[in-house]
Structures are given as structure tokens and as C-alpha cells.
Design a protein with these regions (language model features):
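Structured, active/binding-site neighborhoods that engage oxygen-rich ligands
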Residues: 1-350
């Protein structure tokens, strides 16, 4: 039987992502000295209004695409149960959402060049494999993948394939695919009650088990675009190997990581997908029972602070549920209604 936190895991994760995003946007592109001038990092205030970036916008886009592709809002016993999510249906829904985001007047939050370029090319009939940034492994691939870890009723193959597809439509590098799959799996494990201390080993095991699994049903011939392997298996293995190396750095950093140290110095600045996950994990695992502190730590970094804090918030919220976050913060974060709609639907169907 699910405990109280698990019953609101989806809502907690989505709000955590948005709150981390809103905290981290004002500090993005600032060095540690400039951030320190704002005051103690443990007291970093949530801006008012709590405006978010493309991280939250695209997370909502992925969530809405999942709903459209399954014909439901996440409940069990209907068209959204396991087996209903197909690559063709999800690709159509993601394309529609990504193109709408590209043209939206609210798409003015310093979005990444790779996402913009790919979404512009998706506006038409060309195959998505020809629109993607084939050599890009930017964190735009996995900053938005949390919904794949939260939506109930998916098979393991659907969850992994869909996580990689949503990444691959804009970021075609194998590490972007693997890191997105791994990020979604981390969110799922925590939502299901995995203890934080066991998470790194569980992620390492998952990466090892999937190292040579190329999801051809979902990815088609994507592996042939960047020359990163002679076979589909070699292509995807190169991405998982970079994720495993990032987990190595995470596990090496954890024992001696001081709370006032910049996590980016240990696990990377987070501009690329595997570093964004590793550094977010470092923030979360250093403060597993202090979710607000975890996202503040992610926001007060020299790197891609909004994405690091957003992923850390998604992890913390998946574990602790909506009670992790101050009610006053949740009430004023941008896109509150959309976050609540998705989270409630998926929590109800859990």
C-alpha cells in the first residue's frame, strides 16, 4: 500500500521541478561570487512572481503529449493502461507540443539553441530523425523527462523507449538518450519508495542492464546519424558508458562533499545531460530530507542552475510528495494549474 508521500509523488515531483527551475533561473549564468553577493545560499528566496523557464514549459509539454498519446489522464483501467503508448502516437503528440512551444510568445526564457533549432525543423513533415541535433547531448534532453517516471500504467519498455524518444527528437546524441532514460528511472524509483542511499547502486545496475539495448521501435535509424558506433548496440553503449562515468564521479564525491561546496566542482556544470543528472543527484542525496535546501543548493551553483535545481526538485518531490514544498511557494509558482492537473491525474491513477 502506498504511503502518504507516494500518493502525491507525481504532484510533488512536478512542483519540485518547477520550484527548482524558478529558484535557479535568476542565478543561471552567474559565477559563485555573484551568487554569494545575493546572500547566504541556504536563504535563497523564491522570486515573486515565481517565473519558470523552458525546463518547466517543456516538462508540461511532454506530460500533455503523454496524455494525448494514451487518450487519458493517467488513470488505470482505461485506454492509458500498459500497451497503449506507441512510438507513432507519442511522436505525433510530442511534435505538436514542441512546435506549439516553439511558436509560443511565452517561449522567451533563454531556451537552448538545440531545442529551438530542432523544434523549428519539426514544424513540417520531415522525419524527426532529420530534425534533431544529432550530435547534441545538452541537458534539454533530460530536464523535461520526469513525466516518464511519473505516469502510471506503462511497461518498462514503453517507459524507457518513450524517455529516449522524447530526448531524441531534439538531442540525438546517445548520451542524451541514456541520461534521459536514467533520469526518468531515478524519478520512478523514488516515487516507488527507493531509499536515497540505495539510489546510486540501483541506477548503476539499470545502466548496466540496458547498456546495449537499442530501442529500435522507438528510435528507428537515429543511430546512423552521428558516427558514434558501427552498430545500434555500440551507439547506445557509448551513451550509457558516459552515464556510468558520471555515476562514478557522483559516488566518489558523496562521502566528502561539504554542504557549502559548489556541486558543479565535483560532478560537472550540468550543461550536458549526464552532468545535469549527476549534479542534481548530488544535491538531492546530500540533503535527502531537506528538499528546499536541496533545490537551493542546486540553484546556487556556477553551472546550469535552473536545470540542476529542477531535476533535484523532481527527485526530492518524487520521494517526499507535495508535502515537501511550502504551500505558499506552490501557490505562486507559474503554471500552477497545469502542474496540478497532471500531478493529480497521475497520483489518482497510481
Amino acid at each position: 500500500m502506498a504511503n502518504a508521500a507516494q500518493r502525491t509523488a507525481a504532484t510533488g515531483s512536478l512542483f519540485g521541478l518547477a520550484l527548482g527551475d524558478a529558484l535557479g533561473w535568476p542565478t543561471e549564468f552567474k559565477d559563485t561570487e555573484a551568487i554569494a553577493a545575493l546572500g547566504p545560499w541556504r536563504e535563497l528566496p523564491l522570486p515573486d512572481p515565481a517565473v519558470v523557464t523552458d525546463d518547466t514549459q517543456m516538462t508540461l509539454a511532454v506530460g500533455r503529449a503523454l496524455q494525448a498519446a494514451t487518450g487519458h489522464s493517467g488513470g488505470t483501467g482505461d485506454a492509458g493502461d500498459a500497451g497503449s503508448l506507441t512510438p507513432e502516437g507519442l511522436e505525433r503528440a510530442l511534435r505538436e507540443e514542441f512546435v506549439a512551444w516553439y511558436h509560443s510568445p511565452e517561449n522567451n526564457r533563454a531556451p537552448g539553441h538545440t531545442c529551438l533549432a530542432a523544434c523549428r525543423l519539426l514544424d513540417g513533415d520531415r522525419p524527426w530523425q532529420q530534425a534533431t541535433g544529432a550530435g547534441s547531448k545538452g541537458c534539454g534532453a533530460n530536464m523535461r523527462v520526469a513525466p516518464l517516471g511519473l505516469m502510471p500504467g506503462l511497461t518498462d519498455e514503453e517507459r524507457a523507449g518513450a524517455a529516449q524518444l522524447q530526448a531524441g527528437m531534439t538531442h540525438g546524441h546517445p548520451t542524451a538518450l541514456a541520461a534521459s532514460d536514467l533520469t526518468a528511472h531515478a524519478v520512478r524509483l523514488l516515487a516507488e519508495g527507493c531509499p536515497p542511499g540505495g539510489l546510486p547502486a540501483a541506477l548503476r545496475a539499470y545502466a548496466g542492464d540496458n547498456r546495449t539495448v537499442y530501442h529500435e521501435r522507438w528510435l528507428g535509424g537515429l543511430w546512423q546519424r552521428p558516427a558514434l558506433g558501427a552498430t545500434p548496440e555500440e551507439f547506445i553503449a557509448s551513451g550509457w558508458d558516459e552515464c556510468l562515468a558520471a555515476l562514478d564521479r557522483l559516488e566518489a564525491a558523496l562521502p566528502g562533499f561539504g554542504p557549502d561546496s559548489d556541486p558543479c566542482a565535483a560532478t560537472g556544470d550540468g550543461w550536458i545531460a549526464e552532468e545535469a543528472l549527476a549534479t542534481a543527484l548530488l544535491c538531492f542525496l546530500r540533503f535527502p530530507d531537506e528538499p528546499v535546501t536541496a533545490i537551493r543548493r542546486g540553484a546556487a551553483t556556477r553551472g546550469d542552475s535552473d536545470s540542476i535545481a529542477a531535476i533535484a526538485g523532481a527527485l526530492a518531490g518524487a520521494r517526499l510528495g507535495i508535502a515537501a514544498w511550502p504551500t505558499a511557494w506552490c501557490d505562486r509558482v507559474e503554471y500552477r494549474t497545469g502542474l496540478l492537473r497532471l500531478g493529480t491525474a497521475w497520483d489518482t491513477g497510481r
